[in-house]
């Protein structure tokens, strides 16, 4: 993208972007929630669509001049429906958190009970954390993973649901490397009269590619981000497999009296004007482009390689003596428990940064360290796979990470990090990000 104008007008902002471009191209991105969008997606996000206010929905806006942004939003909606097989979709949420907020606000009242995976066990802030709206406006109860297996015990989930009787159960995670049994979750939800929401922000691309089970057939609501494994712009989305009458009994007047609103009507109104105003039409245009890319055969090949790389890397880590929470991975990420390496997550993150490898410190289940220190790191393969890296690189990267972590207390750690950084730079040079240049 031409940056000559920006460089001349605002050298400081230009420099920050240039430096970030260099960081992305010359270092290895292993944060599980990050990826590289295509230049086509970035071009749509940087287009004139950013100038247009479009409160409302296609064909029913509060502003004039929306005929062309309507085209973009309809393309995004139609492509998302085809990609995931949903009857309803709202592509306007600004983020995954916004999407989750819209669902919770549309079917719950303040003080209602919800259940979600504990944040310290791999859940997400919006699934009931006490520092988040979801744990402050609603009575949140958290289920966790088994101390021995590191996996969710559905029997314990059922026991908690029977005791708590929540109005909504949330299945989803930000640091859980196994799958969710949404059929079992739905059976539990039906038993206690709860609604079921799947948050697939992390594995959405793998689900779209048909590599992981689609939760739409079991869940009342499915939310996701549009970046991460979907490789689109930063944003959110809400889907329903099929529409149904809203459970709160909200009605709408008709010519002959009134009727109960469909859930799609309630959800649309909750997104706008409920929690948002004008949608980000340039981002929605970028979402449309990304969904179009995800519908191509090449995306399925990409998603399959993401999982192969994660599995290969996890296996190599275990060969090197690392503990992976839940014993391995069935998606795009893994959570390394570093307690047997005598290194904290914070220390590992900082040392790996010096070595040109970006990961994030992460709490492990039953962690005795704070979220600012942690006992683990989270590693994901979406971004490295976008660069074209495969199993050979996955194995070597695990070995390089091991070199750094096992040398943490050595006096020559700086030299070791520098040597690893040079090899990482070579690996990245041999696997460039298509269309990116410093």
Curated annotation (Swiss-Prot):
Subcellular location(s) of the protein: Cytoplasm
GO annotation (BP), single: glycine biosynthetic process from serine
Top-level taxon: Bacteria
InterPro entries: PyrdxlP-dep_Trfase, PyrdxlP-dep_Trfase_major, PyrdxlP-dep_Trfase_small, Ser_HO-MeTrfase, Ser_HO-MeTrfase-like, Ser_HO-MeTrfase_PLP_BS, SHMT-like_dom
Keywords: Amino-acid biosynthesis, Cytoplasm, One-carbon metabolism, Pyridoxal phosphate, Transferase
HAMAP family in the cross-refs: SHMT
Cited function: Catalyzes the reversible interconversion of serine and glycine with tetrahydrofolate (THF) serving as the one-carbon carrier. This reaction serves as the major source of one-carbon groups required for the biosynthesis of purines, thymidylate, methionine, and other important biomolecules. Also exhibits THF-independent aldolase activity toward beta-hydroxyamino acids, producing glycine and aldehydes, via a retro-aldol mechanism.
Oligomeric form and interacting partners: Homodimer.
Protein name per its UniProtKB record: Serine hydroxymethyltransferase
Source organism: Chlorobium chlorochromatii (strain CaD3)
Gene (UniProt): glyA
């Amino acid at each position: 993208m031409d940056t000559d104008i920006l460089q001349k007008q605002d050298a400081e902002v230009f420099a920050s972007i240039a430096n970030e471009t260099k960081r992305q191209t010359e270092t290895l991105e292993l944060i599980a929630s990050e990826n590289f969008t295509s230049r086509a997606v970035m071009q749509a996000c940087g287009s004139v669509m950013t100038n247009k206010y479009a409160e409302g929905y296609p064909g029913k806006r509060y502003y004039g001049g929306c005929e062309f942004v309507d085209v973009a939003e309809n393309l995004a909606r139609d492509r998302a429906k085809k990609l995931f097989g949903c009857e309803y979709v709202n592509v306007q949420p600004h983020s995954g958190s916004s999407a989750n907020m819209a669902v919770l606000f549309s079917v719950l009242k303040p003080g209602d009970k919800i259940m979600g995976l504990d944040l310290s066990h791999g859940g997400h802030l919006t699934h009931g954390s006490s520092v988040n709206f979801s744990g402050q406006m609603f009575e949140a109860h958290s289920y966790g993973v088994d101390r021995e297996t590191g996996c969710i015990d559905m029997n314990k989930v059922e026991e908690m649901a029977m005791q708590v009787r929540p109005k909504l159960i949330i299945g989803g995670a930000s640091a859980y490397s196994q799958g969710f049994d949404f059929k079992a979750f739905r059976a539990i939800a039906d038993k206690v009269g709860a609604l079921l929401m799947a948050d697939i922000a992390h594995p959405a691309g793998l689900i779209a590619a048909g590599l992981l089970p689609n939760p739409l057939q079991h869940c009342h609501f499915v939310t996701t981000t549009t970046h991460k494994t979907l490789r689109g712009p930063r944003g959110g989305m809400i889907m329903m497999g099929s529409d149904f009458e809203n459970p709160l009994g909200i009605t709408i007047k008709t010519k002959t009296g009134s009727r109960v609103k469909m859930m799609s009507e309630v959800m649309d109104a909750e997104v706008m004007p409920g929690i948002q105003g004008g949608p980000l039409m340039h981002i929605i245009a970028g979402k449309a482009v990304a969904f179009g890319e995800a519908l191509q055969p090449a995306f399925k090949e990409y998603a399959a390689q993401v999982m192969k790389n994660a599995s290969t890397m996890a296996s190599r880590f275990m060969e090197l003596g690392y503990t992976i929470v839940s014993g391995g991975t069935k998606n795009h990420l893994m959570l390394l428990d570093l307690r047997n390496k005598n290194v904290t997550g914070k220390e590992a993150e900082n040392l790996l940064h010096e070595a040109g490898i970006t990961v994030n410190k992460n709490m492990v289940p039953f962690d005795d360290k704070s979220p600012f220190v942690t006992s683990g790191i989270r590693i994901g393969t979406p971004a490295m796979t976008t660069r074209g890296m495969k199993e050979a690189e996955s194995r070597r990267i695990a070995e390089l990470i091991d070199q750094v972590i096992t040398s943490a207390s050595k006096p020559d750690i700086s030299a070791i990090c520098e040597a690893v950084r040079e090899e990482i730079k070579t690996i990245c040079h041999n696997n460039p990000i298509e269309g990116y240049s410093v």
